[in-house]
């Protein structure tokens, strides 16, 4: 086996395990998007952590997604950041499959709901990389 490290080769952060699935769900609902690039540093809640009042509808989608992940963690042994699940994308429609266990089904529905929310929310480039201390208290 060959291991190649790309650390430092790109300014884009690697996706934690299952977040690649969330990334692909967003691509399903917003074809042509680059979710990890477009949404990882948006508003007060899109990306790592979150606090304060969401700056707009899209940021509220991220806040709701964060809250959903908090709820998922209440299931025994359920880690939403690493939990893989089964889903399908067909012509922009996402379906969480019935073979998911309770944790996977919950996380899948968190991601599905967020991807649909993202697709419906306006994207304001002024809300990318905002001053969190000034806008998110």
Curated annotation (Swiss-Prot):
Catalytic activity: a 1,2-diacyl-sn-glycero-3-phosphocholine + H2O = a 1-acyl-sn-glycero-3-phosphocholine + a fatty acid + H(+)
UniProt tissue specificity: Expressed by the venom gland.
GO MF, any single term: toxin activity
Family of this protein: Belongs to the phospholipase A2 family. Group I subfamily. D49 sub-subfamily.
Compartment annotation: Secreted
Disulfide bonds: 28-89, 44-136, 46-62, 61-117, 68-110, 78-103, 96-108
Signal peptide: 1-17
Cofactor note: Binds 1 Ca(2+) ion.
Protein name: Acidic phospholipase A2 PL-I
Cofactor names: Ca(2+)
GO CC terms in record: extracellular region
Record: residues binding Ca(2+): 45, 47, 49, 66
InterPro entries cross-referenced by the UniProt entry: PLipase_A2 (IPR001211), PLipase_A2_Asp_AS (IPR033112), PLipase_A2_dom (IPR016090), PLipase_A2_dom_sf (IPR036444), PLipase_A2_His_AS (IPR033113)
Catalytic residues identified in the record: 65, 111
Enzyme Commission number: 3.1.1.4
PROSITE patterns, per the entry: PA2_ASP, PA2_HIS
GO annotation terms (biological process): arachidonate secretion; lipid catabolic process; phospholipid metabolic process
Function: Snake venom phospholipase A2 (PLA2) that may act in the hemostasis system of the prey. Exhibits hydrolytic activities, and prefers the anionic micelles (dPPC with deoxycholate) (793 umol/mg/min) to the zwitterionic micelles (dPPC with Triton X-100) (591 umol/mg/min). PLA2 catalyzes the calcium-dependent hydrolysis of the 2-acyl groups in 3-sn-phosphoglycerides.
